[in-house]
């Protein structure tokens, strides 16, 4: 299992060599025998059989090598046709090879000989390994894990204070500060996750951990793995009697998380190889050395292939090794080994394959104990069975320890385990041998029905909702048996007593194998880890080359624009004012290179989840990660900055001196490196993209404002002068300005000058820049210091900070009451009982899956009537254009047919399962019938109760429950349902009836206790997967549809959750609706809850359409009637059997076509007749007709969308609270930096300073708004696609709601900013001027926000929108009128000033404050005249400017609406 739990093929244990002590002493125990010895003398066994003389000589030569060389050399057959390379096919002459340098071909050939088919050969191979180790008396290290009196608690907010509204986020932060100071008592409640549990996990035994969601399984596994840091923890966990402090638990045991965090740009093989390289080989090398020494002494010749395998897998420092290949094979990942893992942006492997990569990542290491959390999610039952079987072989043969949590283990998988731990609400209800578990529950009065999987029974029997159906003591009345009662009864049960007795005797530490527990912190040397990270970083730079190429092109483009704006023929050196324009060009260059570093933020943050996972698993220390990310990206700066400087230096007309050119290039390189380091640090410290964007912009803004150009040094107030001295941009601006203005072309004294200073020095002094030449090197040195500082801070942040946490844990009062009632057996109040007792039939009669049914008569019709409708379809064909990849492989057809003439019918009150293997076309057929396809070619007839289907009307009477459970994250369950009902129920349904109907639906789907729970984002916060599934169903049900399609409603759920969802589905059918579900791999009782089956085979053809029958009898009878089909065995799942006997390989083996057999059957004729019958409209019926496309008017749609957006925004503090907080802080900082500068108008520099305050605020707060709105709109757009397809509303009301909700938040933001800044900077206090200032700020922030929304609307994803919009921000910045005024802009670019929205904002702000002031400045020119001459800003234009600003706002909002209406980036 070495190499990964699944392998540790030598489980020599994870004991590492530590410095000091000889090899011999390391493996000697106290009595003088070797650490791996089992007896004092090793047996001496001779080689058997005759050997080829040549090979015998080769082996003899190998044995004579020194130990170090001997463990690196193996004898392998030569590869035919490979020029003598070894490692190939089975036969041929054998040669001695160095195992450290085996190539992929040789490794593959060796594995083929050892484990050709994982299913058949793995056990044989492991037994060979074990036999080799055992025969020289070496013992495998084992670990026994004990946990005693384990208690874990968390602090949670209960009720409304836990809902993250803008107000709550502020009050909770204040409350936490007051708690910390001891001013206020905390309102949080303590929630116990684990309740005083004790037990033993034995080695060489497989332990299955079961329990419903929220029972504490993940917390328990984390506690066993020594990974609980953030929760209150008491009790102890020991390994072989040793406390956690005595060894390194993260490396001794491997915790495999249920979250699949991987770098999408790496292939599966690269991901596992990197993991293996970091984790090292544990004690495999040391054990191998001892093994070969003993074999040599005993003159034993091992199996050559096994010897080669063990040697190759004991070598450290290989970029890819044999263990990786072995794990890929046994996890069934060979087929996708060289495919990218993928993520949201990169297409990659499937969810099930990704789950296996997560498992394999830890199996390639040398850990001896494995704690695996839900490793089967997304896998089909046969793959899960195969993986668990391989793990079982490794654990049993090589002596590992494993606790594995599974969601819905099939009976055959369940039977692979030796022990069971059943956890419920933090109590251990049972722990011990699998054989005794049913005996315990029978003693408690509960019996598992015949056709019920034991694992499913165990997960349901402790639940209040499900327990009653299993009550077996019919002579006694049933009463609810609470969890506490089960737990205490288990203590008295014989298994519980034996565990208690064993725990009473402490583990004898002297029996612990010296190599069992790992004491070194990392698997390999620091230099090896650094090398591994360097190789990975180089790979990722290559794979992400698009980002760097795009960044370079973007910088070049801006450089090209800059050099044509500051064109040398227009750049003069006749006055200080000319110098200011040159300085503007230099400022713009420095700022663009700073902004170019901003792309490090998302690149850093997207990799952090994987980094934190690997750091916490002790793959490597943070510095081995941060150094490569700094050093290896430096060459990019040379190219990007080189392009910028080489293009622009001469064309702009900077000082024509080659030395000064290279000094400018050197300085810009330092700026580029400093910016990248700064933003990496911000990303590492913030760990969240929204927060990082805010603080990255914030730091950039502060550095820029205090950088010496926007506000001259002599104007910086004394309380902010420290900020000037620590701003990297100050040093950059000083150095680059000194380099230019002390050059020869500025070395002249003006005739009209009052001083003898050169023009260059005067220009420098006019902006408060130090005019001495030494300031170039001071600036350069300071930038190098900042580069070092930010990289060190980045390393420290990644070393000590925790991963970005989930939001504050909260729980509703109803959930808390229900939890306590389940534990203690308290009676629940009426509201909570309403949902707990809403039980209905799940299975067909006699299966034991019945549940007392108290609700049929009253719920049959429900409050709102509906018309039952049937759906028939005949000869449905669906094809798409042939993919280019397939054409490249020689396929000549123009179209690829996915459905081939499928026919069938779905009827009211009949629950139909749509099944088939992956690629059979289940979801495709459902999408075609529901009208959800956005492309492709559809042929055939679809009728609704005999009338041709029209999509506009069909959407009104149908519901579609998608597999992905897409909902707005910031609304509650009841609000989601109200929104759906409001927009989809007919106009004539009044609000009271609507509310009653919603209550009925919530009761039907058991959502009442969760009515006030926030939906949240999947896998991040809010509802669990199973609760989201039920919400998806409820959202469709409140539309009162007649026909409902459900795509995989039980995938990713545990057995109990799947039963709850199926009960919901069954309840829905019992109301008389037509329901069709695609289903993946159902358990027996879920499968038999269906009435009919529509079975498809790969290629899109039906092979069985008809009733299931009692205990699936009709289905079994049909397939067993086909000659050659193997009979089903007793108790076997009919669904699994049916899929197994209808595979393509079975068709080929039997030489039949199941589709042909079905089309020639009597069943097909019956179905044809039924389709004919249902395709004729019943007498007296009429075709579906609705006077309008949507059930509600345009106005109601707008109001409903606005209502939902209001709730979403109010409960989104990371977006709204942070932008309001940021705006307030920026306003206070600006107010203090530009304190009282608004009233100073003596010099032109005073006006530039005031304009600088406006420019910086507008640009940065505006860009912040534009950036931070994008992820919000992107999440809501995916919900919009689902809701529009469901016929809830048209695109414009959605766009209206999204646009309108921004008005109040932006107004508050503008008012906060304007009041603070206006008063502190000291602009003229007149009502008109203040309101003009507020007006321009408000509409500017609004158009920036709408521009960000528009960018999302026009692009397929948030990431692309972010890149596109940032390119335009750079161009806007150039043409604002601040860096270079409009009159100074070359005529060929002046047109852009008129279409740049920020230029109009600055026009409005300047002219409204200064355009009417006639007071003369020190040089006698009136202020308004200077403003008009220098900027070309006319006060008479103020009204027109205001209209233009409003027009830009409306334009961006309109374009957002247009994009949402016309563009659909969802492809189906």
UniProtKB/Swiss-Prot annotation:
InterPro entries per the UniProt record, alphabetical: AAA+_ATPase (IPR003593), ABC2_TM (IPR013525), ABC_trans_N (IPR029481), ABC_transporter-like_ATP-bd (IPR003439), ABCG_dom (IPR043926), ABCG_PDR_1 (IPR034001), ABCG_PDR_2 (IPR034003), P-loop_NTPase (IPR027417)
Gene name of the record: ABCG34
Domain ABC transmembrane type-2: 528-741, 1196-1410
Protein role: May be a general defense protein.
Positions of ATP 2 binding: 916-923
ABC transporter domain location: 178-450, 871-1123
Pfam families, sorted: ABC2_membrane (PF01061), ABC2_membrane_7 (PF19055), ABC_tran (PF00005), ABC_trans_N (PF14510), PDR_assoc (PF08370)
Keywords: ATP-binding, Membrane, Nucleotide-binding, Repeat, Transmembrane, Transmembrane helix, Transport
Membrane spanning residue stretches: 546-566, 575-595, 634-654, 666-686, 690-710, 778-798, 1217-1237, 1247-1267, 1303-1323, 1330-1350, 1360-1380, 1387-1407, 1440-1460
Chain spans, region Disordered: 33-53
Nucleotide-binding among keywords: yes
Disulphide linkage map: none
Domain of life: Eukaryota
Keyword Ribosomal protein: no
Residues binding ATP 1, per UniProt: 211-218
Topological category with respect to the lipid bilayer: Multi-pass membrane protein
Homology family: Belongs to the ABC transporter superfamily. ABCG family. PDR (TC 3.A.1.205) subfamily.
Single GO MF descriptor: ABC-type transporter activity
Subcellular location: Membrane
Primary location class: membrane
Entry's Gene Ontology cellular component terms: membrane
Protein's name in the database: ABC transporter G family member 34
Lineage: Eukaryota, Viridiplantae, Streptophyta, Embryophyta, Tracheophyta
